[in-house]
Amino acid sequence: MFNTYTNSLQWPIRSRNQQDYCSLLPERSESYKLSKAYTSSRCYCVSSRSSCCCCCSTPSSSSFVKPKVLINPGFVLYGVRQSTLIQWPSFQRRLLVGGGRLMGCEVYSSCDGIRRKNRSFKLRCLEESDECCGGRSCSDDVEAMISFLSEELIDEERKWNLVSRVKEKKKVGNVRKVSVEGSNSYGNGRVSQRVKKPEGFGRRKEIKEDVKLNERYDCEHCGRRKKSSELESESRRGSKLVTGEYIGKSYRGDEEREVRPRRRKSSSCSSYYSLASSGEFESDTEDQEEDVEIYRENVRSSEKKVVDQSAKRLKSRKEASQMHSRKKRDESSTGVDSRYQKQIFEEGENSNQAVTLNQRRRKKFSQTENRVSESTGNYEEDMEIHEVHVNDAETSSQNQKLFNEREDYRVHSIRNDSGNENIESSQHQLKERLETRYSSEDRVSEMRRRTKYSSSQEEGINVLQNFPEVTNNQQPLVEERISKQAGTRRTTEHISESSEIHDIDIRNTYVSQREDQIRNQEVHAGLVSGLQSERKQQDYHIEHNPLQTTQSDRTSVSVSHTSDAVRYTEIQRKSEKRLIGQGSTTAVQSDSKVEKNGAQKEDSRLDHANSKKDGQTTLGLQSYQSKLSEEASSSQSSLMASRTKLQLVDLVSEEMQGSETTLIPPSSQLVSRRSGQSYRTGGVSIQEISHGTSESGYTTAFEHPRAGASVNSQSAGELMGFTSHEDAMGSAHRLEQASEKYVGEFVKKAKHGVINPETEEQRAESNQLKRRDSRRSSGGSGAKGPSDEMWVTDSAQGTPHPGATEGNAAVGNAIFKRNGRSLWNVIADIARLRWGSRAGSPDSSAKPAGRSSPNESVSSATWFSGREHDGSSDDNTKGDKVLPQEAPSLHQVEVGQTSPRSQSEYPGTTKLKQRSERHEGVVSSPSSTILEGGSVSNRMSSTSGNQIVGVDEEEGGNFEFRLPETALTEVPMKLPSRNLIRSPPIKESSESSLTEASSDQNFTVGEGRRYPRMDAGQNPLLFPGRNLRSPAVMEPPVPRPRMVSGSSSLREQVEQQQPLSAKSQEETGSVSADSALIQRKLQRNKQVVRDSFEEWEEAYKVEAERRTVDEIFMREALVEAKKAADTWEVPVGAVLVHDGKIIARGYNLVEELRDSTAHAEMICIREGSKALRSWRLADTTLYVTLEPCPMCAGAILQARVNTLVWGAPNKLLGADGSWIRLFPGGEGNGSEASEKPPPPVHPFHPKMTIRRGVLESECAQTMQQFFQLRRKKKDKNSDPPTPTDHHHHHLPKLLNKMHQVLPFFCL
């Protein structure tokens, strides 16, 4: 140690070479890695007469130094080179601490140190040397140098005053101030630092540190020498800006730091050892503290770059956002969505930029941490070297403090990193949410991002950056703002969804309206086409039938009134949804198809028939629109009358007895069976059964939904679709055409019995009308559809009567056999046999001329057209012939025919009376028809098993025509033929000839019913002018089948009571002039019975439905009552119903709420008023399990409750007759006492419906069970078990055990 000191001390004094190596070159330290980065390898001494500026020495000094001593350039003063310290001034020794600070120097003016990071040091060495020294170094005397150094240290101690103040002031906003005051006192290397932790976050702004050191020392041997050195160290330390990206606030802080180095006073010594041993030698810990300060400055400088870079970007983004906000104000017309998207985009951009800035800052902090770790390692190495020289405990304690301080710094940096990581993770999550939520806005975001970046480059504004802690504190605010934005977005989405739903509703409404318009246009087109064809046919038939003009006029007038009815018919047709064929077409389409097949005659007939059907349909629809509450009886009867024209009646052979009959329930029975009146002013309509094309190419319009304008059954709101075989229907059609020419002759023969002069005048006109009706019937009456029920049986053979004419015989002899192809051939055979028997049979009934009774019959043409003709027609004097020939097991009917009267008398003499009938008809069950045509009425009704057409005319024969029941539905029901019910026959007598049909002359039909049997040569039966209308039962009636109505048994009971008068008159057989009057009275009685029965039935159905609904809601009230019982309240529950929905519930809460008014009814009224937002509870129904008390009754009346339904009576406090009566009389068997006065009439709510006793037993049982349980509970509470007995039994046992244990312890 001594040698090292001596050699190293002498060499620098004698050094005169110009270019000598520095004695502290980094090459000497093999282990120091960063030496080349901070120091220069050479020190140039330009003047040989001047010594190097404190750091230069010859390489010979290396020979005097031990070779492998590690020297850290940052701490040069450590180790064996302390001799150099003796020659250096104190300020140079301070500046050299910190690693390579002054390794290259120029003697002339300054020694420029190394620029570390953001710090630059300038050293100006001003030398003023006296001439006495001659520019040379001091004396060679070491002792003189030591004394010089001692004096220098003393002067230095006196003059040393280093004050470094750092002041930061920034005005950013209303934020907290930060002040950091640190003072370092370098006394014996101790460092004490006083730091005030920042209350907020501040910005350190442009710290200038001026260090001025003036030293003066005298050289005793060489005279006075003044050397002043001034060190100016200016470092612009990085400023830290704390910006809250989401709060936009900054903080202001002041930091003041005072470093006052102190030294121990020591006396000068004459030797180096005394100097070192006295402890006055400057401690190396000062350099360590300097290094700590330098490290802090380095950290600050490193943060400065990060802050500067991020601040610029954030400030530019802030300015860009401001620009966007201005743009948004200018572009406010774009709407809420654009503004909302911009706001979301700005938030996303800020979060993304914050994430990138945090990543960069994290990288910088990681680099700083690396440097901290490296400096820590270096510090440990230096401590090892320092421990060789400094061994006292005080120095080690100081080093320990410094080390702890360094560790605090490391912990602080680690916390910063962890905070950054947390912020980064949270911001990553935020970024992911925003990206997933707004992925559809990537393009717009990219464009705006480019705009912002360009604006940021143009602006170039410094933006403040926030600390990690600020971001950490800001996170709740960010989340709150995000939640608000999410709520705003949900609101916007809800508004958009509601607008879309509104648009969809508008579109649907438009589409439905458009469909209605198209439908109406098509219907009108069909009507117009029908009218055009009708006008064409009118020109052809106007000469033959002048009455056709009147019919066409009526049709044209009624067209304008039928659009609404047609629309309603179309809607009802859609609701019924018949399973019908796919080949139905309109009447116009059928016309075109017929033209293709090339039947000109049939085409003209079809056009004519279609035109008439259009007119008749429009009239029917008009009547339907006027009386929608009427039944389908008129439609059925008219259809049955049209069937009469075809004579499709009870023709069943014995072959058919074992076969099955297909009964197809009508659609009207399946749906509503409601139809309107059908005013038929003219034209005979027949029922067409085919739906395909026959051999002649005939088509029908049964099934097409838009041919409804010409469909007669659609006037009743029914689509009569019936599938049949083409060939069978074609044959029937051809047969009908062939029979047209025989209609006139048949009418003449039917009325051959009596000839009236007045009828002879009308004969030609009647024949023409019949021909026209026949053509219309054959042309296209299929559009009118079949009746409500259609029966289909096997074919039977029949032979015409030999007395028939040639044409009739030819037709009648045509026997059609079943070919096995299908069941529809049966219909053709029946039709042929019907027409043949009709043409060939001379059997008829007629009555003499005179005033006709209401039961007198009319011709088949009258049945179809609905007209009543003049009594002057001689056809009325002719007896109507019953045509069926007696054949084995053939069903026959009695038909009386009269010629029609002139149409001019029709409007004044004819009225259509229709009876509203839902399901059943006159006698037994639905779908039977009775047509009564009289001078005053033409009533049509429907019966299940019977279809009786009775036509009464002023002048004409009397007859009853029994039609088979017909049905039309989607799925036919197969029933045995014997289940078909026929009306009982009528035993009729004549006034003139008094001819009666004996039982032998009757033949069995169906189930054994007997009808009069007519022979070919038999004279026509002359029926009395006033005959009984009701049928006479020749044999006991057979039980009738129940087809549709569930109450047909009741109707059968009514039916059994009807024919009593008929039986009595049949037994007596007396024919008197007053019989018609008696029969009329009986019919009125029957009609009253039927009407009252229907009313009863309807009322019963309504009551049953209402009772079911009441029971459903009353059970809900019972549920509420059980809730009250669970809490030991009186089990009374109530529900309030509005439009079929429960809007309020309540149960008794008197005990729980301690409120005497908290009854179930009161709670329901309160909640219902809240639900409806009105104290008026109109159109509501209150269901209560117990009869209301007076308080609740007053509240119910005051709330204007429409209906009250209660269950069990309240015998003590009931306000509905049990105690007092406050409600008006209602329904049910409530507690009504005769002695109670009538209830007062409420002035504002006089009409109120009360229904009593709904689920009375259940409600009463609930109350009884509750009171029984409560009495049991009271009994248990009144007699509780005495607790003394329980303890009394246990106490002696305890004492006994204690006595047993005591001897054990004593032993």
UniProtKB/Swiss-Prot annotation:
Per its record, the protein catalyses:
adenosine(34) in tRNA + H2O + H(+) = inosine(34) in tRNA + NH4(+)
List all Acidic residues biased stretches.
281-292
List where Basic and acidic residues composition bias occurs: 293-321, 439-448, 592-615, 760-771, 866-883
Q: Where is the composition biased (Polar residues)?
A: 367-377, 546-563, 582-591, 852-863, 895-907, 924-947, 1045-1073
Chief localisation class: plastid
Query: Which amino acid positions bind Zn(2+), per UniProt?
Result: H1159, C1189, C1192
**Consequence of gene loss (knockout):** Loss of cp-tRNA editing, decreased chloroplast translation and impaired photosynthesis.
Q: Locate the region Disordered.
A: 245-377, 439-458, 544-563, 576-618, 753-807, 837-957, 975-1073, 1268-1293
Query: What PROSITE patterns does the database record attribute to this sequence?
Result: CYT_DCMP_DEAMINASES_2
Query: Which Enzyme Commission number(s) are listed?
Result: 3.5.4.33
Q: Which segments show compositional bias classed as Low complexity?
A: 267-278
How are cofactors bound according to the entry's free-text note?
A: Binds 1 zinc ion per subunit.
Cofactor requirement: Zn(2+)
Indicate the residues annotated as transit peptide: 1-55
For the keyword Nucleotidyltransferase, the answer is no
Give the residues annotated as active site. E1161 (proton donor)
List keywords of the entry alphabetically: Chloroplast, Coiled coil, Hydrolase, Metal-binding, Plastid, Transit peptide, tRNA processing, Zinc
Q: Per the record, GO CC terms?
A: chloroplast
Q: Which residues form a coiled coil?
A: 280-309
Q: How does it assemble?
A: Homodimer.
The free-text domain note is: The C-terminus (843-1307) is sufficient for the deamination.
- Something else known: Since the absence of A-to-I editing is compatible with plant survival, a limited two out of three codon recognition occurs in chloroplasts, although this mechanism is less efficient than wobble pairing.
Q: Which family does it belong to?
A: Belongs to the cytidine and deoxycytidylate deaminase family.
Q: What does this protein do?
A: Deaminates adenosines to inosines in tRNA-Arg(ACG). Exclusively involved in A-to-I editing of the prokaryote-type chloroplast-tRNA and not involved in C-to-U editing.
Name used for this protein in its record: tRNA(adenine(34)) deaminase, chloroplastic
Identify the species of origin.
Answer: Arabidopsis thaliana
Name the gene for this chain.
TADA
